[in-house]
Each structure stands twice: as structure tokens, then as C-alpha cells.
Amino acid sequence: WIMGHMVNAIYQTDEFVNLGANSIETDVSFDDNANPEYTYHGIPCDCGRSCLKWENYNDFLKGLRSATTPGNSKYQSKLILVVFDLKTGSLYDNQASEAGKKLAKNLLKHYWNNGNNGGRAYIVLSIPDLNHYPLIKGFTDTLKQEGHPELLEKVGYDFSGNDAVGDVAKAYKKAGVSGHVWQSDGITNCLLRGLTRVKEAVANRDSGNGYINKVYYWTVDKRATTRDALDAGVDGVMTNYPDVIADVMNEAAYKNKVRLATYEDSPWVTFKK
């Protein structure tokens, strides 16, 4: 999965997919009442990027639905996965469940079209704080209550705080999650970060009894870092430059080892070599 980083304006979706991304990451900010409000990152953000692009969250979802609904004039068949980077740092811990409920209702209405031929992309809810694990239950319970438990087949989870792998496992246990787990590791492109924890996450994924299904590394903009990440065995790379990642994947060392994921590749099934 080549994951376009910080895609917060609707027009950027096409831009990133046309450069080679089959997945995008979008920031979601919340208002004081835990309503998802804007797709907005703000300052500071990655070096070399504008931090201030934004849409109303519901408008973004409608645009995303168009881009991921076959038959729509704006349909992009390559776009198969969307990571919502949930900026829950602005919320009190006791609002996490409420944020999950509201997120579920927004997605159900504006993205899934109330279960009636909505967008087809897989969704990853990425949460920065392990204490906000109740967001997951708020989300899953709401989809069930609204009569659409089948849509949970399209939803996965990520804790993005670079916490110890064992602590992340405990948070999932509390949230009642087994499966559909992506594990992120990374840092802004302005700084360097080694691959120690990525390798630990990959080992958990491949152990046969770990909690992780897929591992992604962010933010990767350089060819050398891309090679290191691919060598470490990641499933996804989040980047500001999808074309760079696509180029590296076409190099002799990689072109027979890795390929771009398609819609038929389940993002929840651990790849067995």
C-alpha cells in the first residue's frame, strides 16, 4: 500500500492517486463536543508541505465517496484504503467514546450512504492515544445499533503513538478488538527515525500469535528510506511523494518481491510469504 500523506482537500485525492498512491491518509479534527469537524492538520506539519488545507469533514466524506464508488464520474479504481488520522488530542479522555459514535454516524450517512451503494474503500481508524481506546467501542456499537454491522468488515484500527508493542496489545484487548489491526510506526519527515520498532512490529505480525495484521511506516520521502522499509518487510509506506515509492518498487531488487495492493487484497489478512 502506497499511502498518500495528509490528503485533506478533496482535489488532492486525485493528485496523490495519479502519482501512484492506492491509499490516502486524512487528518480529522474534532470540535469541543467531539463532533468530527474538519479534515485539517495545522502547523507544524511535514517539511515541504502546506499544513493548512482543509474541508468540512462531511464534505470530504462525500468527495471520497464519489472517488470510491464504481460508476461515479469521479471514481478512482486504485484508491482502496483510507486512514483517518483522528486528532483526538483536543478531546478529554471521557469524550473518546462519544467521538467514536459521532464518527460512525458521519461515515454511515456521508460515506457509506446508509449502506446503499456507498464508497467501497477500506477504512482504518488511527488513534494517537492508547487511553482513547473507548472510541473503537463507541464506533462499533453505533454501527451495530444503526443496523449496519456488515460495514465493520470494511473497518480496521491503528494506534499511532509509537507506544510499546505490548501496551498497544493491551489497549486492543480492552477495546475488544481482535483482527483488522494495522500498526504504524514513524515520525515527521523533518526528523530521522530508525527501524527498531518497525522490525518488532513485523516480528509480532509474523509470529502467528501476535495482534498485528499489517505494518506501515511513515513519513517516507527518500529512496534510501523506502528501500530500508521494504527490506524490513512493511506492508505499507506513507509518503508525501507516491511516485518515489512506486519508482523504488520497480527497481530490480523489488519488482519481483513486492507489488501494489489491489481491491482484492484484504487489508486485514496477514500476508504469508
Swiss-Prot record:
Highest taxon of the lineage: Eukaryota
The cofactor(s) it depends on are: Mg(2+)
The UniProt note on the cofactor reads as follows: Binds 1 Mg(2+) ion per subunit.
User: Which positions are annotated as binding Mg(2+)?
Assistant: 25, 27, 85
Catalytic residues as annotated in Swiss-Prot or TrEMBL: 5, 41
Where found?
A: Secreted
Q: Which reaction does it catalyse?
A: an N-(acyl)-sphingosylphosphocholine = an N-(acyl)-sphingosyl-1,3-cyclic phosphate + choline; an N-(acyl)-sphingosylphosphoethanolamine = an N-(acyl)-sphingosyl-1,3-cyclic phosphate + ethanolamine; a 1-acyl-sn-glycero-3-phosphocholine = a 1-acyl-sn-glycero-2,3-cyclic phosphate + choline; a 1-acyl-sn-glycero-3-phosphoethanolamine = a 1-acyl-sn-glycero-2,3-cyclic phosphate + ethanolamine
One Pfam family recorded for the sequence: GDPD_2
Q: Does the keyword rRNA processing apply?
A: no
According to UniProt, the tissues expressing it are described as: Expressed by the venom gland.
Could you cite one Gene Ontology molecular function of this protein? metal ion binding
GO cellular-component term (any): extracellular region
Read off the Gene3D superfamilies from this record. Phosphatidylinositol (PI) phosphodiesterase
Cite the InterPro entries for this sequence.
Answer: PLC-like_Pdiesterase_TIM-brl
Q: Which GO terms describe its biological process?
A: killing of cells of another organism; lipid catabolic process
EC code(s) of this entry: 4.6.1.-
Coiled-coil stretches are none
- The disulfides recorded in the entry are 45-51, 47-190
Q: Tell me which UniProt keywords the record has, alphabetically.
A: Cytolysis, Dermonecrotic toxin, Disulfide bond, Hemolysis, Lipid degradation, Lipid metabolism, Lyase, Magnesium, Metal-binding, Secreted, Toxin
Describe the function of this protein: Dermonecrotic toxins cleave the phosphodiester linkage between the phosphate and headgroup of certain phospholipids (sphingolipid and lysolipid substrates), forming an alcohol (often choline) and a cyclic phosphate. This toxin acts on sphingomyelin (SM). It may also act on ceramide phosphoethanolamine (CPE), lysophosphatidylcholine (LPC) and lysophosphatidylethanolamine (LPE), but not on lysophosphatidylserine (LPS), and lysophosphatidylglycerol (LPG). It acts by transphosphatidylation, releasing exclusively cyclic phosphate products as second products.
Q: Which family does it belong to?
A: Belongs to the arthropod phospholipase D family. Class II subfamily.
Q: What is this protein called?
A: Dermonecrotic toxin LhSicTox-alphaIA2avii
Q: Which organism is it from?
A: Loxosceles hirsuta
